């Protein structure tokens, strides 16, 4: 099937840094000769300048056109529909590389213009809501015009090597397939960075580490570890197994959560007295009898001593199994970059690495008690020096 990829926000930072370079690799692979790209922009743009600056790819430049429109005008979406002129053998992927505050209204306009036929798919970046209530509202709004199987919610951590390696091992190794409390003492998932917030002051001040990483990325990775893989299991029901695992996790206890902020953060965001956490760690438990008694912990932070994305399985015999992105990426088994893989799977209609509505809502339910406690300042906010080790904060 021919594919038209429509990118809302093609001139933005994410598009230049991630999407266009990923598309360069895809078109150069030769596997998707029937792919064309339509970049939606509020102002006229030079295709060659935009694409070649980001990718230095003449091939991608030739496959890309710019459609200029006002994102707040309903009639412009009708113009877009007519411009795309989708045929029975074509599909359209609507990639919303836009701020979350704009996404819901764009979806409304797209649906109202009739751009919601079965061969049209929506691709969203996180965050999927600011809290449980806003997530429920956003899911309800997208559901007015689009069915769940048309909606592809992107958590790029699910397309990274760590997630792929866990899935691979758990589906081929009998021991990993039967992970549980008989052999495992604890599971720790860590995403640490050496950098601070850089140029994301406004976003981070509104979001914080709990919302930015734990509610989404790390909770999804945890579900891969905890999910039941008893037959009949196929990769296509992966989301169903992830959700079942999430449903067994008890809502988080604020007394088992830690928040901290690196020294200098308040000056960076020009908000002296800010209580936004740049480090968050949440201890969890599962009601699943296979995981009863196993300590679960999700940890993330900025301005720490090292960059690490890892899942650490600690066994009762004192050994451990570490799924570390840096180690996996150094092998010959390296996968395509996350955004490249996301786009390829969306084109092919394979949804197993995308996050479903029920998963999003359950993840929010789990972290809500911690979120509310931190908003009420019921939990101390400690400070740490940039370059601190994770274990020194825990």
Report each predicted region and the residues it spans.
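Secretory/organelle targeting and membrane-embedding segments
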Residues: 1-123, 128-394
């Amino acid at each position: 099937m021919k594919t038209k990829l429509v990118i809302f926000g093609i001139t933005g930072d994410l598009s230049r840094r991630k999407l266009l370079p990923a598309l360069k690799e895809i078109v150069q692979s030769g596997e998707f000769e029937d792919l064309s790209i339509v970049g939606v922009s509020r102002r006229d743009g030079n295709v060659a300048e935009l694409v070649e600056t980001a990718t230095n790819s003449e091939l991608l430049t030739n496959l890309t056109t710019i459609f200029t429109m006002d994102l707040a005008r309903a009639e412009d979406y009708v113009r877009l529909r007519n411009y795309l002129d989708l045929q029975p053998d074509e599909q359209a992927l609507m990639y919303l590389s836009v701020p979350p505050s704009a996404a819901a209204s764009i979806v409304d306009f797209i649906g109202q213009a009739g751009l919601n036929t079965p061969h049209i798919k929506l691709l969203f970046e996180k965050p999927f809501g600011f809290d449980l209530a806003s997530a429920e509202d956003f899911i309800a709004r997208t559901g007015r015009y689009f069915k769940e199987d048309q909606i592809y919610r992107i958590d790029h951590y699910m397309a990274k090597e760590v997630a792929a390696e866990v899935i691979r091992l758990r589906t081929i190794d009998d021991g990993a397939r039967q992970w549980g409390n008989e052999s495992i003492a604890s599971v720790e998932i860590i995403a640490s960075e050496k950098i601070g917030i850089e140029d994301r002051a406004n976003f981070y001040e509104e979001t914080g580490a709990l919302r930015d990483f734990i509610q989404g990325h790390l909770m999804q990775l945890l579900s891969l570890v905890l999910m039941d893989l008893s037959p009949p299991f196929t990769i296509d029901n992966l989301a169903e197994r992830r959700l079942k695992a999430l449903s067994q996790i008890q809502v988080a206890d604020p007394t088992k959560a830690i928040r901290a902020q690196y020294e200098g953060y308040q000056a960076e965001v020009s908000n002296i007295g800010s209580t936004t956490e740049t480090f968050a760690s949440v201890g969890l438990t599962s009601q699943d009898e296979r995981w009863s008694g196993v300590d679960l912990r999700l940890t993330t932070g900025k301005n720490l001593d090292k960059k690490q994305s890892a899942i650490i399985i600690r066994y009762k015999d004192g050994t451990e199994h570490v799924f570390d992105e840096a180690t996996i990426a150094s092998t010959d088994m390296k996968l395509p970059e996350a955004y490249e893989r996301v786009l390829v799977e969306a084109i092919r209609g394979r949804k197993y690495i995308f996050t479903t509505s029920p998963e999003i809502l359950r993840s929010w339910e789990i972290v809500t008690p911690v979120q509310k406690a931190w908003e009420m300042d019921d939990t101390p906010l400690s400070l740490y020096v940039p370059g601190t080790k994770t274990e020194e904060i825990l």
